[in-house]
């Protein structure tokens, strides 16, 4: 068995990931809140649509491994970023709000994309995952369940990046208008429950107020913790949509990496490991996710994205409006009830 394409592929991916990580830590990237994850996929796409086809057979096995197994490992290790103590800091209000926003956003996206826009189901599911939970990381995690093609994943990530970036500029303006209706703590929960990416949530909070920033990040982390049960629900939903008779028992494919993700978060809550070791796991996790993003970019072709047309961006715009307007109404209502 020729193992060269595997190891050469991993080395190639590692080089791109290291470069993306370096660029993601520059002052320019910090100023414009451009994460290493986004840089990795952009680098991957740039290389993948230019010189990569000339030597793809020499590295393909390693690239595919990075896109699959390394991604799942990264999702599992993501649990070391969270503890259940985070939930107690923001209370029941944030938990209920996050759950309602996750479910409503996903099914709003699915209904709109599949029934009215007649879009590809896998693309709609990926977009719904990214908009309702934690952006690009959720899209990539959902890809492992849906088995979607690379160009569909890239389109979904593009939607998350574009409209999440738009949120960085619009939410601070909305805060000025909404101060008479909700306080800084409540607005933080609103940001955390409705903005796509963790980095975008932090950027918005920092641009407004420390209270907003802290509450928003914790609220967002609660949404991230809902990733595993969401993936289980998505797996069940995909099984139901396969056209199997209702009288037939359905075999639900369990994404075990999602179950392990919950297990790691629970374990991390007991604070049994030295902080230095947990920090190391988080750093390894970041590198694995960056690597899988690079692999995704390499296997994405611009021509395939063009074929998607305008419908994905129409879906992105309407979902963004739901997150901003519907999200505010949900948060305002919950704040009055709880």
Curated annotation (Swiss-Prot):
Magnesium is among the record's keywords: no
GO cellular component: plasma membrane
ATP-binding found in the keyword field: no
InterPro entries assigned: UPF0324_pro (IPR018383), UPF0324_YeiH-like (IPR004630)
TM region positions: 5-23, 33-55, 62-84, 94-116, 123-145, 155-177, 222-239, 254-273, 280-302, 312-334
Pfam family, one: Cons_hypoth698
Membrane topology, from the record: Multi-pass membrane protein
Keywords: Cell membrane, Membrane, Transmembrane, Transmembrane helix
Location relative to the cell: Cell membrane
Entry's family note: Belongs to the UPF0324 family.
Designated name of the protein: UPF0324 membrane protein NMA0465
């Amino acid at each position: 068995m020729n193992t060269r394409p595997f190891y050469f592929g991993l080395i190639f991916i590692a080089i791109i990931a290291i470069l993306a990580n370096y660029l993601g830590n520059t002052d320019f990237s910090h100023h414009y809140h451009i994460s290493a994850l986004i840089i990795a996929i952009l680098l991957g796409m740039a290389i993948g649509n230019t010189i990569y086809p000339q030597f793809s057979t020499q590295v393909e096995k390693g690239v595919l491994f990075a896109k699959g197994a390394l991604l799942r490992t990264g999702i599992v290790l993501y649990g070391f970023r969270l503890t259940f103590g985070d939930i107690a800091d923001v209370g029941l209000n944030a938990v209920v709000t996050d759950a309602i926003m996750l479910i409503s956003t996903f099914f709003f996206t699915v209904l709109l994309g599949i029934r009215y826009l007649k879009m590809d189901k896998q693309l709609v599911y990926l977009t719904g995952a990214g908009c309702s939970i934690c952006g690009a990381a959720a899209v990539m995690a959902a890809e492992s369940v849906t088995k979607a093609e690379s160009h569909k994943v890239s389109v979904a990530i593009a939607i998350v990046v574009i409209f999440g970036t738009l949120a960085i500029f619009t939410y601070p303006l909305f805060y000025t208008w909404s101060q008479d209706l909700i306080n800084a703590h409540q607005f933080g929960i609103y940001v955390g429950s409705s903005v796509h990416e963790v980095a975008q949530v932090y950027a918005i909070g920092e641009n407004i107020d420390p209270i907003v920033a802290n509450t928003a990040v914790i609220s967002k982390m609660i949404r991230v913790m809902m990733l595993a049960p969401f993936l289980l629900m998505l797996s069940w939903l995909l099984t139901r949509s396969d056209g199997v008779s209702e009288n037939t028992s359905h075999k639900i494919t369990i994404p075990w990496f999602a179950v392990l993700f919950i297990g790691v978060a629970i374990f991390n809550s007991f604070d049994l490991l030295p902080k230095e070791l947990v920090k190391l796991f988080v750093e390894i996790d970041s590198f694995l996710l960056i690597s899988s993003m690079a692999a995704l970019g390499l296997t994405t072709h611009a021509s395939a994205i063009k074929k998607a047309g305008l419908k994905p961006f129409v879906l992105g715009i309407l979902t963004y409006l739901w997150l901003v307007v519907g999200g505010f109404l949900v948060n305002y209502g919950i704040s009055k009830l709880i």
